[in-house]
A protein has these predicted regions:
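Short consensus segments that form the blades of beta-propeller domains
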Residues: 15-19
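Generic short beta-strand segments
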Residues: 6-12
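Short, mixed-charge low-complexity intrinsically disordered segments
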Residues: 46-121
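A short, charged, amphipathic alpha-helix used as a generic interaction element across diverse proteins
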Residues: 32-45
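Short structural boundary motif marking the start of a folded domain
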Residues: 1-5
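A short, exposed loop/beta-hairpin motif centered on an aromatic-Gly-Thr core
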Residues: 20-31
Length: 121
């Protein structure tokens, strides 16, 4: 089975007053949900950057890139009706549920522009 693993990672540096957070989505193949979670944690942890040599900076501050955890794990629904039964173009691999205050925010979100959202999951 295939899973989409939503990993939360963040930048850490001395004296910060807010956190820049990334949600990285990894495609994981596993025999079940427990195994997928273990693999997802391993994959995400391998992307940490804990070096202190200064090559990674946030707002001029030496930073580290840290893995916080797996926020959600979603089983990818393969298209059984077509008989394909495998990953192919057009398969939905993940989703998110968001809420905004008005339609102009829907349009900004769809255009990739910054807007405020309420994450519903």
């Amino acid at each position: 089975m295939w899973y989409s693993a939503h990993a939360i990672c963040y930048f850490s540096y001395f004296g910060q007053d807010s956190f820049l957070v990334h949600e990285n989505v990894y495609l994981v193949e596993a025999g079940g949900e427990d195994q997928a979670m273990l693999i997802a944690k391993q994959v995400a942890a391998e992307h940490e950057d804990l070096s202190e040599d200064g090559h990674l900076e946030v707002n001029g501050n030496k930073a580290q890139y840290r893995f916080a955890g797996i926020r959600k794990l979603i089983e990818v629904e393969l298209d059984s009706e077509t008989g394909i039964g495998k990953l192919h173009s057009g398969v939905e691999t993940t989703y998110s549920v968001l809420e905004v205050d008005d339609f102009s925010e829907v349009e900004r979100l769809a255009a990739g522009e910054m807007t405020s959202v309420l994450y519903r999951e």
